[in-house]
Regions:
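ABC ATPase nucleotide-binding domain
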Residues: 5, 26, 62, 372-374
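Short coil-to-beta microelement around the adenine-binding A-loop and adjacent beta1/P-loop entry
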Residues: 16-18
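The feature captures the beta-strand-to-loop junction immediately N-terminal to the Walker
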Residues: 36-38
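Helix-to-loop junction immediately C-terminal to a conserved catalytic motif
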Residues: 51
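ATP-binding/catalytic-site motifs of ATP-hydrolyzing domains
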Residues: 60-62, 66, 212
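ABC ATPase nucleotide-binding domains
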Residues: 73-234
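Non-catalytic connector elements of ABC transporters
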Residues: 250-391
Length: 391
C-alpha cells in the first residue's frame, strides 16, 4: 500500500519561524494529489517533510503502514523528482536511470530490464546512450521521471517538475505525466505554484496559504464551491471578481446592491444571506458568470449591468472584457496576497474596482463602447467580509 497519511503536521525552524501548522492530508493508494499555493506558503516544505529532507516538528507522517518521522529518506521507499532534474552530467541517460538500482546491488540483467521498460514507457529508448547536455528540457524531464520509475517506489514526490519548461512544452508534459500516472497508478504528491497544473492533473487539490491547509477536494469542487475568499481568488484564471455588496430582502428575494448596480437573487443560499440583512458582504463573480446581453440565455442570465469596455482581449475561443466600477475595491489580506502573487498592486486602483468578464467570442463589442452584460445569479459566490469564509 502506498498511502501517505499526514496527521497534524507542523514545522517550526530553530529561529522560531513557523512554516506549517496543523496540516492533515491523506493521499490514498494510487491517488494523485497536488499541493498548490503562493510562493512561500509551505507546500515544498511539506513535500520535503514527507521525503525526510526536513525534520517534522509536530505531528506524524506515515507512508504505507509505517510511521516515518524518524526514518531516513533512503529507507522511506519513495522517489523524488526535482525542478532542476538533478541529473549527473557525466553519466549517460542509461547510467542516470540505473544509478539507484546499482547502489542497491540489483543483478545486472534486472537493472537492464527495469531501465529498458521505463525508457519504453517514457519513449526515450533511443536516448539511453546520450549525455544530459545533448537532451532538450522535455527529454531531461523524462529521464528524471525514468530514474524515479525504475525504483518502483510506494510513492512519487514531485517538486515543481515542469516549471523550467517553456509554456508549450509544459502543456505537453502535463498530459504525459497524467497518462503516466494512469499507467503506473503510483501514489503521487505533486507540488506546483501553477493553479492550471493543479486543476488539470490532480485527482484532488490541496490549497495551502501561510502554512495552513485551506481546502482539499476535487478540482471541480474547489472551483465551484471554494470554502473561503482566498481559495476562490487563487483558483481560476482570470481570477474571480470581488466587490462589496449590500444585502436587502424584498418579497422573499435577495437584492444585492453594489454602486448603482442591483442584482436580484433567489437561489438556494438566500436563507443564509438573510442574516446579513442591511449589511455588506463580499460578492464573488467569476468571469464566466457574465455574458454579452446579445448572446445570453435569458433563463440563466436573468440579471444585467451596464458597463463601459476599457479593454477587450480577443483570444479566438473566448473574449475578455475589462471594465471598472466606481466602487472602493475589496481590500482584505487574502485578496492583497493573491494580487501580489500575480504581480498586481491593489493601491493603483484608487476608488475603482476592476472586473473581467468572459463573453462569447462572436461578440462585436469594442473598446470604449457602453454595453449590457448579463449575469447568471446561480454562479454567484458570497463571503463574510470579516472572516473571509463562504456564506
Amino acid at each position: 500500500m502506498g498511502e501517505i497519511d499526514i496527521k497534524s503536521a507542523g514545522k517550526i525552524y530553530p529561529n522560531g519561524t513557523r512554516a506549517l501548522e496543523d496540516v492533515s492530508i491523506t493521499i490514498n493508494d494510487g491517488e494523485f494529489v497536488v499541493l498548490v499555493g503562493p510562493s512561500g506558503c509551505g507546500k515544498t516544505t511539506l513535500l520535503r517533510m514527507v521525503a525526510g529532507l526536513e525534520d517534522i516538528t509536530e505531528g506524524e507522517i506515515a507512508i504505507g503502514d509505517k510511521t516515518v518521522n524518524e526514518v531516513a529518506p533512503k529507507d522511506r521507499d519513495i522517489a523524488m523528482v526535482f525542478q532542476n532534474y538533478a541529473l549527473y552530467p557525466h553519466m549517460s541517460v542509461y547510467d542516470n536511470m540505473a544509478f539507484s538500482l546499482k547502489l542497491r546491488k540489483l543483478p545486472k540483467d534486472e537493472i537492464e530490464q527495469k531501465v529498458k521498460d521505463a525508457a519504453k514507457t517514457l519513449e526515450i529508448s533511443e536516448l539511453l546512450e546520450r549525455k544530459p547536455k545533448a537532451l532538450s528540457g522535455g527529454q531531461r524531464q523524462r529521464v528524471a521521471m525514468g530514474r524515479a520509475i525504475v525504483r518502483s517506489p510506494q510513492a512519487f514526490l514531485m517538486d515543481e517538475p515542469l516549471s523550467n519548461l517553456d509554456a508549450k512544452l509544459r502543456v505537453q508534459m502535463r498530459a504525459e505525466l497524467g497518462q503516466l500516472h494512469t499507467q503506473l497508478q503510483t501514489t503521487t504528491l505533486y507540488v506546483t505554484h501553477d493553479q492550471v497544473e493543479a486543476m488539470t492533473m490532480g485527482d484532488r487539490v490541496a490549497v495551502i496559504r501561510k502554512g495552513e491547509l485551506q481546502q482539499i477536494d476535487t478540482p471541480r469542487e474547489i472551483y465551484s464551491n471554494p470554502k473561503n475568499i482566498f481559495v476562490a481568488g487563487f483558483i481560476g484564471s482570470p481570477s474571480m471578481n470581488f466587490v462589496y455588496a449590500k444585502i436587502k430582502t424584498e418579497n422573499d428575494v435577495i437584492e444585492l446592491t453594489f454602486g448603482d448596480n442591483q442584482i436580484r437573487y433567489k437561489d438556494q443560499k438566500k436563507e443564509k444571506l438573510k442574516s446579513f440583512e442591511n449589511k455588506e458582504i463580499i460578492l464573488g463573480i467569476r468571469p464566466e458568470a457574465f455574458e454579452d446581453g446579445y448572446f445570453a440565455n435569458e433563463a440563466d442570465y436573468s440579471e444585467s449591468i451596464k458597463v463601459k469596455v476599457s479593454l477587450l482581449e480577443q483570444l479566438g475561443s473566448d473574449s475578455y472584457v475589462h471594465f471598472y466600477k466606481d466602487i472602493k475595491p475589496v481590500q482584505t489580506e487574502a485578496i492583497e496576497e493573491i494580487l501580489a502573487d500575480e504581480g498586481e498592486d491593489i493601491t493603483v486602483l484608487g476608488d475603482s474596482t476592476k472586473f473581467i468578464a468572459r463573453i462569447n467570442p462572436n461578440s462585436t463589442v469594442a473598446e470604449g463602447e457602453e454595453i449590457e452584460l448579463k449575469i447568471n445569479p446561480s454562479k454567484l459566490h458570497f463571503f463574510d467580509p470579516v472572516s473571509g469564509d463562504v456564506i
